[in-house]
């Protein structure tokens, strides 16, 4: 069995709160496609693998992304320059950046973190989350 990496060797992450401004609503699967295509257009395949955008949570119109710390500027610029999805105008606004999901939810999205914490605790009791 493989050992886990010590914290000093793990990849550092940042969490980005964003808002999608558009005439239509998008489901979570489409938001993943929007973000991936924005990063692919601006950075290419190699840049997308380095940025490593991962959608943590999305509720229309705002969401949370997890990103590699070193390539945060590439993500910011690629999301700002993305202006069209499926021939519809779209604008992605970055609300804020933090190093924890809890701070993103409370400071930028103004949502209490407690309901999410309770769900995680229930899953831990059922041994579904480690």
UniProtKB/Swiss-Prot annotation:
InterPro entries the record matches: Pop5/Rpp14/Rnp2-like, Rnp2-like_sf, Rnp2_archaea
SUPFAM superfamilies: Rnp2-like
GO cellular component: cytoplasm; ribonuclease P complex
Coiled coil: none
Protein's cellular compartments: Cytoplasm
Gene Ontology molecular functions: ribonuclease P activity
EC number: 3.1.26.5
Domain of life: Archaea
A Pfam family the protein falls into: RNase_P_Rpp14
GO biological process, one term: tRNA 5'-leader removal
Record Gene3D superfamilies: Ribonuclease P, Pop5 subunit
Reaction it catalyzes: Endonucleolytic cleavage of RNA, removing 5'-extranucleotides from tRNA precursor
Assigned protein family: Belongs to the eukaryotic/archaeal RNase P protein component 2 family.
Quaternary data: Consists of a catalytic RNA component and at least 4-5 protein subunits.
PANTHER family, alphabetized: RIBONUCLEASE P PROTEIN SUBUNIT P14 (PTHR15441), RIBONUCLEASE P_MRP PROTEIN SUBUNIT POP5 (PTHR15441:SF2)
Function: Part of ribonuclease P, a protein complex that generates mature tRNA molecules by cleaving their 5'-ends.
HAMAP family named among the record's database cross-references: RNase_P_2
Protein name: Ribonuclease P protein component 2
Record organism: Methanococcus vannielii (strain ATCC 35089 / DSM 1224 / JCM 13029 / OCM 148 / SB)
Origin organism lineage: Archaea, Methanobacteriati, Methanobacteriota, Methanomada group, Methanococci
């Amino acid at each position: 069995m493989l050992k886990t990496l010590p914290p000093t060797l793990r990849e550092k992450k940042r969490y980005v709160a964003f808002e999608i401004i558009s005439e239509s609503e998008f489901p979570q699967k489409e938001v993943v496609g929007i973000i991936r295509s924005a990063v692919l257009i601006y950075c290419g395949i190699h840049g997308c693998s380095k940025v490593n955008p991962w959608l943590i949570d999305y509720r229309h119109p705002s969401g949370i992304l997890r990103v590699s710390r070193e390539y945060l500027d590439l993500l910011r610029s690629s999301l700002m320059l993305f202006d069209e999805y499926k021939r519809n105008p779209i604008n992605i606004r970055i609300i804020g950046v933090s190093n924890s999901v809890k701070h993103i939810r409370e400071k930028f999205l103004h949502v209490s973190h407690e309901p999410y914490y309770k769900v995680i605790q229930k899953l831990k009791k059922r041994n579904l989350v480690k």
